[in-house]
Design a protein with these regions (language model features):
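DNA major-groove recognition helix of helix-turn-helix/homeodomain DNA-binding modules
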Residues: 45-60
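Short amphipathic helical patch at the helix-1/turn junction of helix-turn-helix
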Residues: 1, 12-13, 40
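Recognition helix of helix-turn-helix/homeodomain-like DNA-binding domains
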Residues: 27-40
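Residues in the helix-turn-helix
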Residues: 20, 31, 60
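Short amphipathic recognition helices of helix-turn-helix/homeodomain-type DNA-binding modules
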Residues: 62-64
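Short alpha-helical elements of helix-turn-helix
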Residues: 5, 29, 43-47
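Short basic helix-loop element that most often maps to the first helix and adjoining turn
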Residues: 5-24
Length: 64
């Protein structure tokens, strides 16, 4: 699992910190950091919550 640069770029486009995104979806900042670093495999429900918050699709953020 590589770094999730797509997630980081989408978060930055929305002018959100890792903490802002974490608060918006109900997880810790560390969880967002680990997902972006490719060290944590989020559940489908968490992926969907992130996508809704960032106005992106699963394809755009998580799948190639």
């Amino acid at each position: 699992m590589g770094k999730n640069l797509k997630l980081k770029m989408a978060r930055v486009e929305h002018d959100m910190t890792q903490g802002d995104l974490a608060d918006a979806i109900g997880v810790t900042r560390q969880t967002i950091g680990l997902i972006e670093a490719g060290k944590y495999n989020p559940s489908l429900a968490l992926c969907i919550a992130i996508c809704k918050c960032l106005d992106k699709t699963l394809d755009q953020l998580f799948w190639e």
